[in-house]
């Protein structure tokens, strides 16, 4: 009974997990969605600002509350991510699990991903999109707006050190965001990059504190004549890079069988389409260069940089390793 209760708790907390196939349809034509995403971003922000202004003069928490109604995860009924996933106006690739690199996944490799209902309830395989040349999952916006918000609150409001914030993110990814056999069985460093960049986005809205990469992009919103106003438009091209792409920032499988299945799928893709690459990373030089901007020292007993907590250090798809960030 105790084990069933534990299973149920982990399962319930894992329901926001979905996985992305960054390979199967990668080389099919797909229109860049960055322009429409940016346009809708600023429209949603203006609508949230209008609602917040109706609650009083420049009330900060009211503003965040209204923005969070739109910029949130699907399970919290975030309206923008629901639009991204479902709207025909936003170009995307839809891939069923049976056609994906996870088609050999067994229940014991990742329950949420391998169960029959995975293709029907949106918790299994997510959609993929071309954002300014980066082939990313729609789930990365959920990570930016969901986990990114929690990173932001922990660092800028609760006084967590950045190392502690990143540790919490590592634990969440392992325990209930995919990286265990009860969830999807896939540990995704690219999600951690999205979380971190989401923290930057939330901070830049009002410029609550210094940017951790030293790039002050905000404030996007300011109090003008006792009312909130969008004074600068958001451009998510400032945040999204190759670190979001799971064909560059390689994922880890939590079981040997899950890893064998993914490698088998990639081998089949290579045989079917030998003129294109189906490996990770697709471009070693690019992911190495992108990683450099995150190499900001975070101190502490173990030292290291933020990049150590955000990027797969082995530069390949492999079985999950405990304490991988300390390698």
Q: How should each PLM-predicted stretch be described?
A:
Residues 4-12:
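Sec-dependent N-terminal signal peptides
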Residues 17-167, 178-192, 196-327:
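Intrinsically disordered, low-complexity, mixed-charge
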């Amino acid at each position: 009974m105790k084990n069933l209760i534990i299973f149920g708790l982990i399962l319930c907390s894992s329901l926001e997990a979905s996985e992305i196939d960054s390979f199967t349809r990668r080389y099919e034509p797909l229109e860049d969605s960055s322009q429409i995403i940016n346009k809708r971003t600023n429209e949603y922000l203006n609508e949230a600002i209008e609602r917040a202004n109706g609650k009083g003069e420049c009330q900060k928490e009211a503003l965040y509350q209204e923005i969070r109604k739109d910029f949130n995860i699907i399970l919290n009924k975030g309206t923008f991510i629901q639009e991204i996933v479902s709207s025909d106006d936003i170009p995307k690739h839809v891939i069923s699990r049976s056609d994906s690199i996870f088609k050999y996944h067994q229940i014991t490799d990742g329950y949420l991903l391998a169960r029959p209902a995975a293709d029907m309830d949106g918790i299994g395989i997510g959609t993929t999109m071309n954002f300014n040349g980066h082939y990313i999952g729609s789930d990365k916006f959920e990570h930016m707006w969901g986990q990114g918000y929690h990173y932001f609150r922990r660092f800028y409001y609760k006084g967590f050190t950045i190392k502690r914030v990143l540790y919490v993110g590592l634990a969440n990814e392992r325990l209930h965001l995919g990286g265990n056999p009860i969830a999807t069985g896939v540990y995704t460093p690219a999600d951690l990059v999205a979380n971190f960049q989401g923290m930057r986005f939330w901070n830049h809205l009002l410029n609550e504190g210094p940017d951790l990469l030293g790039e002050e992009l905000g404030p996007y919103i300011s109090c003008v004549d006792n009312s909130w106003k969008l004074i600068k438009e958001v451009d998510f091209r400032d945040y999204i890079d190759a670190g979001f792409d799971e064909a560059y920032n390689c994922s880890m499988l939590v079981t040997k069988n899950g890893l064998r299945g993914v490698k088998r799928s990639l081998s089949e893709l290579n045989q079917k389409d030998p003129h294109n690459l189906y490996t990770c990373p697709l471009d070693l030089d690019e992911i190495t260069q992108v990683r450099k901007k995150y190499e900001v020292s975070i101190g502490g007993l173990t030292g290291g940089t933020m990049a150590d907590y955000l990027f797969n250090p082995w530069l390949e798809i492999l079985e999950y390793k405990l304490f991988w960030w300390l390698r």
